[in-house]
Each structure stands twice: as structure tokens, then as C-alpha cells.
Amino acid sequence: MSSLGRILSVSYPPDPYTWRFSQYKLSSSLGRNRRLRWRFTALDPESSSLDSESSADKFASGFCIIEGPETVQDFAKMQLQEIQDNIRSRRNKIFLHMEEVRRLRIQQRIKNTELGIINEEQEHELPNFPSFIPFLPPLTAANLKVYYATCFSLIAGIILFGGLLAPTLELKLGIGGTSYADFIQSLHLPMQLSQVDPIVASFSGGAVGVISALMVVEVNNVKQQEHKRCKYCLGTGYLACARCSSTGALVLTEPVSAIAGGNHSLSPPKTERCSNCSGAGKVMCPTCLCTGMAMASEHDPRIDPFD
């Protein structure tokens, strides 16, 4: 009984009024905290989802599956939620980068217009293919005729060298040592075999075949790239703005009031920047989403990330 009395004396405060006041103060503070908590959750109902998405984005941004053409990490052991978070994060980054490129190009066009710089080559930012012929520019659809003329000139030159120039140098000038006719005569073979030099013929035929094959490959590459381009914007990624007729400015029309007996000159028309294209004169192509490709998708089998 004495120990029970000690426990009761220790458990309860000696003053009942102080105990009631402290209990009321504690309950009021807990109620206030609950009301504040409910208020914050009502103001921001998506706080939990945002926190989860931000944590998922942080995890996805720090994880790199493909660091280069030779280093690809194994992601087969990832959980399903991790895979979904990484897909969502990377898709969002793709569209954000595309929007940044679109705005940067619009701003670049505005700056070029203000400075009076007109460069049409920047409008066609398509990949160029290096030529197999030295000292020639990269192969595009514009200079394809130049490549045709160059290849035909090389083939004609090789044929003329093997058919006319080489026999003349060999027979009349004695360049090249023993002629092929003397070699055939020394072996007591029919002289009809000496009418064609196999060395010159093989050199000429091989050169013509190699140049023709390479030219066919280059032409096929150009045609394939043309098929990959968007059919609406022709690979530029942008279309002409229909509101300002690709000028970037709108003419403000004001009503003109005629005053009897008055000769007043009309005020010059006022212009303002087009709000549809932001003064660039071009808008985003809705088909390719500024990529210039015929199909913009991660499922496109024609897109090689290591090309």
C-alpha cells in the first residue's frame, strides 16, 4: 500500500488546477496543429504526389542507362516502378528540350531579322554526308547534280586514259618498259592478244566499277534521307505563319474619318509583332514537332542513337 501511494503521488501533480490548465493547453495546441495541417493539405492537395514525382525525377535524373556507344548499363534488374519513373522522366526531358530548341530558334530568327542577317542555310539544319571524292563538299540533294557531273567526268577520263593515252605512251614513247606486244611475241602467242593490254584494261575497268558503285550508294543515301524528312515542312521543322504571311509583323488598320473641306494626310500604318509566331514568321510543324523527321517517336526503327 505504501508503494502504491508513492506511485499515485508521483503520477499525479499535487495541484489539480495546474494539471487541468496544462491538459487544456496541450489539447488546444494539438487541435491548432491539426487545423493547420488540414489547411495546408487543402491548399496543396497534390503535395504528396509532387513529392513522390520529384523524388522519382531525382532518382531518374541520376541514373544513366546509356553513357556511350560502348557502355550500356544493365537495367534488367530494375523494379517496375523504377522503370516507369525513368520512362516518365526521360519523356518529359525530351519534350522540354524540343521546346527549348523551338524557342531558341525563334529568338535566333528574331535577332537575325533585327541585325539584317539573312542566312537560308540555317533554316535547313539537316545532316550532311561526307563525300567519298576528295575536295568535294558534303553530299546533299542540292549538289547531287554536281556529283553526277564529277563522276561521269572521272569515268570518261579513265576510259580515255586506258583506251587512247596508255597505248600511245607505251608504243610511241616507249614508257613502261617492254610493251605487251613484245611480251606476246616473245611467248610465240597469237598477236591478236596484244591488241588489248590486260593491265590497263583491268585498272580502267576496276576504277570505273568502284566509282559507279560508290555513286549508287551515295545516291541511295540521299534518297533515303529525303524519304525520312517531313512531307509538310520539307525537313525544316517549321511552317510559314498564316496570320502575318511569314513577315513577323501585323499591320494595324485604323478607321479613317473624312472631314469636309479638309486636306489631311493619312498617318503611316502602324505595325506590331505577330503574337502567333512571336515575330519569327514561322510556327512549329505539328506533324514532326520541329524535328524535321517524317515520324518522331521512340519506337521508330530508323532512328539509330549511335549513328
From Swiss-Prot:
Glycyl lysine isopeptide (Lys-Gly) (interchain with G-Cter in ubiquitin) cross-link, chain position(s): K58
Positions of CXXCXXXG motif repeats: 241-248, 285-292
Membrane-spanning parts: 146-166, 199-219
Cellular location(s): Plastid, Chloroplast membrane; Nucleus; Cytoplasm
Maturation and modification: Ubiquitination at K-58 by UBC19 is essential for nuclear localization.
Region of interest (CR-type-like), ranges: 208-299
Keywords: Chloroplast, Cytoplasm, Isopeptide bond, Membrane, Nucleus, Plastid, Repeat, Transit peptide, Transmembrane, Transmembrane helix, Ubl conjugation
Reported induction: Decreased levels upon illumination, in both nucleus and plastids. Induced by TCP14.
A biological-process GO annotation: response to light stimulus
Family note: Belongs to the orange-like family.
Entry function: Involved in chromoplast differentiation. Associated with a cellular process that triggers the differentiation of pro-plastids or other non-colored plastids into chromoplasts for carotenoid accumulation. Is associated with carotenoid accumulation in chromoplasts. Functions as a major regulator of the phytoene synthase PSY1 protein level and activity. Modulates carotenoid biosynthesis by means of post-transcriptional regulation of PSY1. Modulates carotenoid biosynthesis in part by up-regulating a series of endogenous carotenogenic genes.
Additional facts recorded: Its sequence is related to the DnaJ family but lacks the J domain. The CR-type-like region is similar to CR-type zinc-fingers.
Protein name (Swiss-Prot/TrEMBL): Protein ORANGE, chloroplastic
Organism: Arabidopsis thaliana
Gene from which this protein is expressed: OR
